[in-house]
Amino acid sequence: MEENNNIYPIFDRMLTRQDKEELLKQRGVMIWFTGLSGSGKSTIAIALERELHKRGLLCRILDGDNIRTGINNNLSFSETDRVENIRRIAEVSKLFIDTGIITIAAFISPNNDIREMAARIVGPDDFLEIFVSTPLAECEKRDVKGLYAKARRGEIKNFTGISAPFEAPEHPALSLDTSVLSLEESVNRLLEIVLPRVSRHE
């Protein structure tokens, strides 16, 4: 069978990341929130997106609600699928970042290996790891979805913080304890490190 030689690489004709960042007047970056369930990751992510939007900056939030029901709806919560879940999230995030979009991810991502994998895929220079360090006792007290109660009763297996471990990041760009900091304080601290990273200096 004759080999098809009619497929040619088109990367030399594609617009570059720089072209897109110049159009958007911003730099793409990954803001990766990690922490226990109920620590405040998604709440802070949403508030941060609103503040960046007010400043004319384009963002995209990725979290369990829009990932597990979409691109990763065929994955279980087995160890292998949890790793694949994060791998896919990182690959999708890289596409957004290469388009100049500020990408905000809020996932438990419970160990250093899995987060380091995400950072390698995205690229360490574009990866800001934010540890929402709210203590387990406070997360369990909030328990908005009743997940901790179910985990304590043994109804949920391998639940991070109860029956499965959580490894705190070794060198996060920022640590936020929402049992101490208000939402406004948390977002202000984030803006201090995020705005210099996403601003283009012409």
UniProtKB/Swiss-Prot annotation:
Catalyzes the synthesis of activated sulfate. It catalyses: adenosine 5'-phosphosulfate + ATP = 3'-phosphoadenylyl sulfate + ADP + H(+). InterPro entries: APS_kinase, P-loop_NTPase. Its EC number is 2.7.1.25. GO terms for biological process: hydrogen sulfide biosynthetic process; sulfate assimilation. The lineage of its organism: Bacteria, Pseudomonadati, Bacteroidota, Bacteroidia, Bacteroidales. The keyword Repeat does not apply. ATP binds at G35, L36, S37, G38, S39, G40, K41, S42. Keywords: ATP-binding, Kinase, Nucleotide-binding, Phosphoprotein, Transferase. This is Adenylyl-sulfate kinase. The active site is at S109. Pathway: Sulfur metabolism; hydrogen sulfide biosynthesis; sulfite from sulfate: step 2/3. Pfam families: APS_kinase. PANTHER family: BIFUNCTIONAL 3'-PHOSPHOADENOSINE 5'-PHOSPHOSULFATE SYNTHASE, PAPS SYNTHETASE, ISOFORM D. It comes from the Bacteria. The gene is cysC. It is an enzyme of class 2 (transferase). GO terms for molecular function: adenylylsulfate kinase activity; ATP binding. NCBIfam families: apsK, PRK03846.1. Belongs to the APS kinase family.
